[in-house]
Structures are given as C-alpha cells and as structure tokens.
Regions:
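Phosphodiester-processing cores and adjacent nucleic acid-binding clamps
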Residues: 1-191
Length: 192
C-alpha cells in the first residue's frame, strides 16, 4: 500500500525531525525520478510521494517549574500543522528541557496555551489525561478534561483509540467513544 503521509513523534523533543524530514524528501525525490522514467517509457507511474508529519509527545504536568514532587504528568502527542506549528513545538520542547526538567522534560497547560497555534492535539491513549482519569478517577472528571482539550484545540483535538486486547483499553475506548459522539470530536485508531 502506498501511504500519502507518515508521522513521527519523539518523546519531549524534536531531535529526530531533521533526519526524518530529510529521509522523506529523499524518498520523494527518488519517487519523482522513477515516475519520470516510467512516463518516458510509456508506463504508468506508480511511486507516491509522502508528506512528512512532525510531532512530539509531551509530558504535560500541573506545574512544569515545580520540583517539590515527582509529577511526570500525562503523555499528550502534539502535531505541527505547518512551519509555525513546528516552531511552537520547538518552543514547548525547549521550555520542557530548560524550565520543566524534573525526572523527565515537562510542560504544563499554561505554557501549552501560549504555543498552541497551528498545533493538533491528540488525547494520548491510556497515559493521556482523559484516559487516565477514566481509569483512575471517574467519568465526570474525565469528561471535564476532555472538554478542556476540545475547548482549547477545537477541531484540532482528536481522540486516540487503542486496541491491544487489554481490558483497560476496552473500558477507556467505550467511554471515549461516548464522549466523542456527545461532543462531536473526531477519533482515530492508534498503536502506542
């Protein structure tokens, strides 16, 4: 199958983004050359260029500057929509390492709100805020968090559904699908 796009999300940094984009662009150059040769030979071109999608999975805690207790936060993947979004991911990553490093590089919702433009947010599966609240606290608190993400990111908030045969995933998926239907949020299959 020919994929039109491929994404990469490093944990808390964008260190692999340069090599990732470079390799996709090299693939696209090779695909274009092969398609040109096919056309010149009277054949149907079969190579498909790919779009590189750059993202970062952040540890989102209550206060990224606090070092009074270990709070690794929730794991939330963010995707750049464009160059400005990429720059915002880079700013978030820098803040995570410069100001928020305590066991892991962390950000919080306040700094996320400063750099959310042109960024897509995913719910984060079982280790995301909503999934964790469904499992460990309760549906009302999970729905409150769900609505916060929807309010902040609007149509750029997507829910991840995981299926590895785990009972926890089944429980979380059932509730997430209910929230998605109730609040008109899109979802997708993920494999975290």
């Amino acid at each position: 199958q020919k994929m039109p796009a491929v994404a990469m999300t490093d944990h808390a940094n964008l260190m692999g983004a340069f090599h990732f984009v470079r390799d996709i662009l090299a693939h696209n150059k090779s695909a274009a050359a092969k398609n040109k040769t096919a056309i010149e030979n009277g054949e149907e071109p079969t190579e498909v260029p790919m779009k590189p999608i750059v993202g970062c999975e952040f540890f989102v805690c209550k206060d990224h500057k606090s070092k009074s207790n270990k709070d690794n936060g929730y794991q939330i993947p963010l995707i750049a929509k464009n160059k400005k979004g990429y720059h915002n991911l880079a700013k978030l990553s820098s803040a995570a390492y410069i100001d928020g490093f305590y066991y892991v590089p962390r950000i919080d919702k306040n700094i996320l709100l400063q750099f959310k433009d042109d960024v897509i947010a995913f719910s984060g599966g079982l280790r995301g805020e909503v999934g964790d609240l469904i499992l460990n606290v309760g549906e009302p608190q999970a729905e409150e968090a769900f609505l916060w993400w929807k309010e902040q990111f609007g149509d750029d908030f997507y829910v991840e559904l995981l299926r590895h045969g785990l009972e926890e995933e089944n429980r979380v998926n059932e509730t997430l699908l209910k929230f998605c239907k109730l609040h008109n949020v899109k979802y997708f299959a993920a494999n975290d």
